[in-house]
């Protein structure tokens, strides 16, 4: 009988953390062993299962990842860039692999993550949903066929508490398109604003961003020509699809030694 992969979760009390824990508990191949919060958090020492409403599971909330180094195989992190980089230091020190779902990294921070991948195995993805990763492939193919004849726009919608914009997923969609078109996403993007904007530049990707209510996540890519329009849309109805993909990634990366991976590697796309 195969041993279960022991997983540590950072930010276990947040929306994503709760979903991850519930999915781990439902997965026969994984086992939650560590739940890490910020220093001096008021819930330290409490059973995380009781806190998130699934009953006691024997995992106490801690702010000391270093003393838990022998208790987990893979860390899953959906926090913020500064926190992720700190957890990466721990993982590198203790030779633990990590799954990163945090978004909003700067180029310099991405370079730091890449440097750590020479010593440990890292999966980083803007979106762990299987559906959104299939969307990336559809967008790539569509861009190859009609990209040069279309105005391309990305519309993304998220809940009012999301702190980064555009979303990491929207930016990744932009990168997929830019690679096919041989564009530079940083230079060849339009972020719509009021006023006289002039005629739309055909060789740019337009971004429209909505933050409202409790929208989990919706991304639409529009390919518009003079004669027709194609829309490709992915809508997440809840966060469980993200959690399942992250757990699948943790199981996949458990036995890897080093390297930087994403969901296309996990899904063999």
UniProtKB/Swiss-Prot annotation:
Q: What are the GO MF terms of this UniProt record?
A: 4-hydroxy-tetrahydrodipicolinate reductase; NAD binding; NADP binding; oxidoreductase activity, acting on CH or CH2 groups, NAD or NADP as acceptor
Pathway, per UniProt?
Answer: Amino-acid biosynthesis; L-lysine biosynthesis via DAP pathway; (S)-tetrahydrodipicolinate from L-aspartate: step 4/4
Query: Which biological process, per GO, is one annotated for this protein?
Result: lysine biosynthetic process via diaminopimelate
Cite the binding residues for NADP(+). 39
Tell me what this protein is called. 4-hydroxy-tetrahydrodipicolinate reductase
Q: Which UniProt keywords apply?
A: Amino-acid biosynthesis, Cytoplasm, Diaminopimelate biosynthesis, Lysine biosynthesis, NAD, NADP, Oxidoreductase
Where does the protein end up? Cytoplasm
Residue positions binding (S)-2,3,4,5-tetrahydrodipicolinate: 159, 168-169
**Protein family membership:** Belongs to the DapB family.
Q: What is its EC number?
A: 1.17.1.8
Protein function: Catalyzes the conversion of 4-hydroxy-tetrahydrodipicolinate (HTPA) to tetrahydrodipicolinate.
Where is the catalytic site? Answer: 158 (proton donor/acceptor), 162 (proton donor)
